[in-house]
Amino acid sequence: MNMSHSSPEADVLVVGAGLAGLVATHELVKAGRTVHVLDQENRNNLGGQAFWSLGGLFFVDSPEQRRLGIEDSYDLALQDWLGSARFDRDDEDKWARQWAQAYVRFAATEKRDYLRDLGLRVTPLVGWAERGGATADGHGNSVPRFHLTWGTGPEVVRVFAEPVLEGERRGLVRFGFRHRVDELIVEDGAVVGVRGAVLEDTDLDRGRASSRTEVGGFELRAKAVIVASGGIGHNHELIRRNWPTERLGPCPETMISGVPAHVDGRMLAITETAGGAIVNRDRMWHYTEGIVNWDPIWPDHAIRIIPGPSSLWFDANGKRLPAPCFPGFDTNTTMKEILKTGYDYSWFVLTQSIIEKEFALSGSEQNPDITGKDLKLTLKSRVAKGAPGPVEAFKQHGVDFVVADTLRELVEGMNKIARGPQLDYDDLERQIVARDRELANKYGKDSQLMAIANARRYFGDKAGRVAKPHRILDPAAGPLIAVRLNILTRKTLGGLQTDLSSQVIRPDGTAFPGLYAAGEVAGFGGGGVHGYNALEGTFLGGCIFSGRAAGRALAARLT
């Protein structure tokens, strides 16, 4: 194997060409620093996972919120964040707590203007994700905060990629695609470079799984290294090894992947071997509403349904999930409720009226109207009668969908695709009829219907997100639809511990000279800025905030 060597021709080496790496590089280029960006994938994958995202951004007290009559504040947002995070580890959460306060402050002040100055815009309706549903000081967003990027994930990538590519044209940035880092070089207690393998060239499209055939080696040196390599979302072995069984229940036997194959988590162990501290390994953020992509891009490609609150949710035994396990309310509590049955899937039961207004699909490619910034298509697909085209395509082609005119036919279809027990028609009918009877009055005792009524008091939900309450068994609202929901892997909430400048911390609590980390590999900041739970719209923001911190710190410190 040929080995290419390099003297420190760049100020900084960035490992990972995803969003966090691009943001850090952008900040360094603004300061006139030279950067060498390495990634094991090809140039087509510039932007990493962020490209595939819906582009949700967590803003606090934004103009969009105020126009919709939403009263938000730093204090309320921090209350929600800390109530969701539930930081309880003095050592592992030491920096995470500080990152949480700093990030919420960023979201309430600079974040929107920082992105707007780069050309990013958001849609006017603000979404209400992770609504919580328990107590004011517990998990969840008290108010809508999910701002959707006009252009979705590709636009978030674009606003940072364009200035970085301009830096490449100016000679400040070099890319080393198909360069897989296998080792951090440590000399005299400081990180001074990286070693790794050059992988064979490929022209595969973005997101496709690529080969790991080695054709050479490399060694590169710089004044500092930023690790921005992402999490473990497609590495099911690592997920199983770190799964929090005591907290969430048994690890699912069947998991489908919400991120591409290159999201392998390799750099976590490599950085730990070099001397960096990993904290909060057992904290993850996977989704309970995963469906198999009928038109996959990567292996085991999963899409998440981002649901409105009206679908009835049943476990694998056909028992309706209790409060607050309603669609879009409390991801980890619902995960625990599902897994305690001993099965790793659940069911939505809904109507055509609900799917038309309440089903959104995660992913830029599943929202071509917003991704393409096509206002006419957006109005047609979101306002016109019928579900958006991609949702209808899943209803017709998805292996997890059952459509029927009667409940008996629906249950028969559900039982054909069940991976566990056969559902009892009479019991399912009893539960649905009981719920439907509660609609006879404008008030009642069904917690989910109360939550729906609360949601529809918010204009954004009533106008575009929450269906008018109706009986599930009303033929006029049909046909009936059932969706088998799988566990979808996604985010690593723990990771490399970092201080507020994104410098990696060693196990003894001291800063690691020459080593920084940003994005998911650092738990989106500090080794776990979200604690145990996320409020959504915070993952892209965590990459941006931690990447910005790393870039700005090194721009100031390097001479």
For the regions a protein language model found, what residue spans apply to each?
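Extreme N-terminal leader/targeting segments of oxidoreductases
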Residues: M1-V12, K30, V529, A556-T559
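N-terminal glycine-rich dinucleotide-binding loop that anchors FAD/FMN and/or NAD(P) in oxidoreductases
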Residues: F51-W81
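An anion/pyrophosphate-binding glycine-rich loop and adjacent beta-alpha core
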Residues: L268-I270, A274-K416, G420-L423
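A glycine-rich dinucleotide-binding beta-alpha-beta segment and adjacent secondary-structure elements
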Residues: G420-G525, V529
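Conserved redox-cofactor binding core of oxidoreductases
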Residues: W99-F218, H236-I239, I291-V292, I432-D474
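Beta1/beta-strand and adjacent pyrophosphate-binding region of the FAD-binding site
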Residues: H5-A20, H36
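Glycine-rich loop(s) and the adjacent beta-strand/alpha-helix scaffold that form part
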Residues: T202-W294, E536, L540-A549, A553
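Glycine-rich FAD pyrophosphate-binding loop
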Residues: K30-F51
